Amino acid sequence: MIVLISSITYAQKGSWYIGGVAGYGSNTTEPTNGTKSTTTSWAFGPEIGTFLKNDIQLGFILGLNGSTDKFGDDKTSEFSGFSPTVYVRKFKKVTDNFSLFSGLYFNYLSGTQKEFNPDDESKASGFGISLGIGAAYALSPRFTAVGQYGLLGYSSVTFKQNDTETGKESDFNVGVNTVGSSSFVQGNGSGAVFNIGIYYTFK
């Protein structure tokens, strides 16, 4: 689930908006003869931004997320991630209530993976850049429905174990989560390629 808050079609230069993304998920596998396994995950990304011009939007998302794996009642692994994102969007007004936009997203990627049987810890850090497109429809002077699709994305992540570099991973993908993702760091949103939300604006 993703929830975004701001207003676009009625926004003017100097307008500010707040909002964010939030998500939670849980998956349990319980075989007929065996021990159940459970994975839970969450994501939270408060957002703030402003309009530099009537059609140029600058925003920042502070991305936090994590997950836990259990086998029976025993925790087997745990992940925590931090992925702040800065973005710039350019809007094109089609009608009084409807606009199209394109956006460029830059994000820092970091995360820690802990294994408990046996004890082990891996860390990763890097960066990502992506291009997205979307549409905005004004429901009222304050509320706007927004949908966005991640077209292209590139990320580069370095992995370390006990402060020793163990590898690097670079990805270039068509169809990406515009608020940050990689195989190690899932970012600050739902991980979805297409996101829909409601925005709210204030002066």
Give the ranges of each region predicted by the language model:
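Outer-membrane beta-barrel translocator domains and adjoining extracellular loop/strand segments
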Residues: 28-39, 68-79, 111-125, 158-166
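Outer-membrane beta-barrel proteins
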Residues: 32-36, 48-50, 74-76, 90-92, ...
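Repeated loop/turn-to-beta-strand initiation elements of outer-membrane beta-barrel proteins
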Residues: 55-58, 96-98, 137, 142-145
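Predominantly the C-terminal beta-signal and adjacent terminal strand-loop region
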Residues: 70, 139-203
